[in-house]
Amino acid sequence: MSKVYDWFEERLEIQAIADDITSKYVPPHVNIFYCLGGITLTCFLVQVATGFAMTFYYRPTVTEAFASVQYIMTEANFGWLIRSVHRWSASMMVLMMILHVFRVYLTGGFKKPRELTWVTGVVLGVLTASFGVTGYSLPRDQIGYWAVKIVTGVPEAIPVIGSPLVELLRGSASVGQSTLTRFYSLHTFVLPLLTAVFMLMHFPMIRKQGISGPL
């Protein structure tokens, strides 16, 4: 085993990386509220795992979506547990994200030199809200249908570009199969990819700049 470790150590300097991670200074004023960002990340990872598991059974069509969700909840092995964890974790992720934003704002964590960290965090917050909107429509039940109809109808109040923007969101003049396909693609591919990209920007900046000092 030591030979294998030595082989990787010689090429990747694993020990130096481990020392850098474990020896990072943590300011004495840090408390449990500084863990909210990490909890949000944990919820996101749970979302990815449980969401991926449900893709094996979910069918993104207007005629089969609701039935496939029922199948997950009543017949698929541990499907009820996986979907329930997905829903609970989604709510927890939104709550932790909101509390994290408040904590950063109230402690001045957005000030120089952490402006870009704040900007990427705000983008991650918008992406989190987008997860909620797109995911809400996927069961294709009454609540999801009307929620999507209302949300996608909001831009119609914008002069000139309102109607084309609504049609772009829905894929047609009304909420239908094109809307479900768009939201499913956004929820399972586009948003997770964008979230991962901005997280890869967000965390190294925190690592580089460290935790902000007390007020």
UniProtKB/Swiss-Prot annotation:
The keyword Transferase does not apply. It is a multi-pass membrane protein. It is found in: Plastid, Chloroplast thylakoid membrane. One of its GO terms (molecular function) is electron transporter, transferring electrons within cytochrome b6/f complex of photosystem II activity. Gene3D superfamilies: Cytochrome Bc1 Complex, Chain C. The keyword Glycosyltransferase does not apply. Binds 2 heme b groups non-covalently with two histidine residues as axial ligands. Binds one heme group covalently by a single cysteine link with no axial amino acid ligand. This heme was named heme ci. Its cofactor is heme b; heme c. Heme c binds at residue 35. GO terms for cellular component: chloroplast thylakoid membrane; membrane. GO terms for biological process: photosynthesis; respiratory electron transport chain. It comes from the Eukaryota. Pfam families: Cytochrome_B. Its main location: plastid. The chain crosses the membrane at residues 32-52, 90-110, 116-136, 186-206. Heme b 2 binds at residues 86, 187. Heme b 1 binds at residues 100, 202. Belongs to the cytochrome b family. PetB subfamily. The 4 large subunits of the cytochrome b6-f complex are cytochrome b6, subunit IV (17 kDa polypeptide, PetD), cytochrome f and the Rieske protein, while the 4 small subunits are PetG, PetL, PetM and PetN. The complex functions as a dimer. Heme 1 (or BH or b566) is high-potential and absorbs at about 566 nm, and heme 2 (or BL or b562) is low-potential and absorbs at about 562 nm. Component of the cytochrome b6-f complex, which mediates electron transfer between photosystem II (PSII) and photosystem I (PSI), cyclic electron flow around PSI, and state transitions. This is Cytochrome b6. It comes from Vitis vinifera. The lineage of its organism: Eukaryota, Viridiplantae, Streptophyta, Embryophyta, Tracheophyta. The gene is petB.
